[in-house]
């Protein structure tokens, strides 16, 4: 196998969760670590987060968000680099020595924490109409999703802040990161939003505008890099037609464990407690910043 030893992977996953969440100020109350031989080739890490928010904000339902034509496309948080490119597709592929390193995001938990505080204050002051993260697909996903509300968008990629020079337009558009968000901001509210961002030391940049043209228009230094119909973008791909065969197997009843009379079960108990899926994980959990 080209995979690192399971122990190394396990320690790396735990360290990543511990460091990232502690530094970004998000409480981690627990966690579950389960071992199954069927996942030896590709371990899975699931992270679930629960958030609390008021039922209403500024007299409107807090859960409702809708970008409007004429709103500014504002990118906030971390800068764009070659890391995180094709991360969404990378997660669904077989891992091997030739897997692209650039698919892995190089995160910045401190930037994420500052951005979180900035967004909460901007939210309470009703300074944006909609917001979406730059996770899978980066700007292509966040802008493309919110442009459904308005029926189009125009993006100027040369305005996107970069970690370094040398990125192609398509790389700028799809690079993904968790500490980067896209906001739909009314033009008259941008200056106040910028003041709050400066207080929290968060970089925000106008990278385009939502339109109602029916097209997603992507430009780089006034050169058109992409011009896609919104209808095609969201509904143009053919759908898979999958077939499956169900091999029914009747569930066999579990054998009942009946110990011999007056037998000493201490060794059985110790063996059970020594199993990786039963043994206590308290030492690991206590390292999380509750």
Regions found by a protein language model. Give the residues of each.
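Glycine/proline-enriched, intrinsically flexible loops and inter-domain linkers
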Residues: 1-290
